[in-house]
């Protein structure tokens, strides 16, 4: 069962359907069933996978639980919003189904007093201020173990493949790894003045936040885009890349013994950065609700409605990406 039907979900479903021998049956479930139906229609006649669709509100554990019990999947792939990780994990625990996701939990309402108290305590203890971290999901580890279930977190490319690269390098090439630099270069061009490659709300919150890296057992935090490097990426060329906080730093620091420093860099063009800074300066990246003409809206969610749908970018994008790790 795939929960979510955005850009990442579309890619995941297409890849599953290219492997029909493994994924013989597949349900796509999302808040908007028409999007699931449209994705199913794209694949009709192109795959042997039997696809069904359903509507579900991933914020509601009871709805998720009922749908999972009805369909009885072997595993749930969560490619919805990171805000919904905990509700989907809870539904998997209640139904005895394995869980997979691509991004760690992040709170939607960062002004919620209960969440804020836990968040501020974590900031003091860990030393970074990102709104997303693994602690919320790692707290469920014992429950998944006791139920005999697997929860595979961060199973995209970064995090995901980059973590596999790191584990493989440690097992086969190095006695010790002292430093890991993860480099993510998007050399593609979609032709728009400004767009994001995945959910704009998540993407812009991540990029506009403080950066951080792991060094000598501690977190070191930086201002947004403070650390810039140039790198000549194979098949892409020279690009500017910037240090960001990214979730696999947290998991690699925990699981790579003896590592002294872990950093994450991502490339951005000047047009992207200029647009983002302008939007931030006028308050459009805010997650706090405001009143507008008698209605409550969240600025960054309103912005999301104006920007191109990430799921529409694939057919019009040309170029290459280059993602990998540098070990010492």
Residue ranges, per PLM feature:
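C-terminal catalytic/substrate-binding lobe primarily of soluble NAD(P)-dependent oxidoreductases
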Residues: 171-328
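Conserved Rossmann-fold cofactor-binding substructure of NAD(P)-dependent oxidoreductases
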Residues: 56-73, 80, 84
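N-terminal Rossmann-fold NAD(P) dinucleotide-binding loop
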Residues: 9-13
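Conserved N-terminal Rossmann-fold NAD(P)-binding element of oxidoreductases
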Residues: 1-7
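Short beta-strand element of Class I
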Residues: 25-27
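Glycine-/Pro-rich loop/turn segments that contact NAD(P) or position catalytic residues
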Residues: 82-198
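Rossmann-fold cofactor-recognition segment
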Residues: 45-60
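Helix N-cap at the beta1-alpha1 junction of Rossmann-like dinucleotide-binding domains, i.e.
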Residues: 31-35
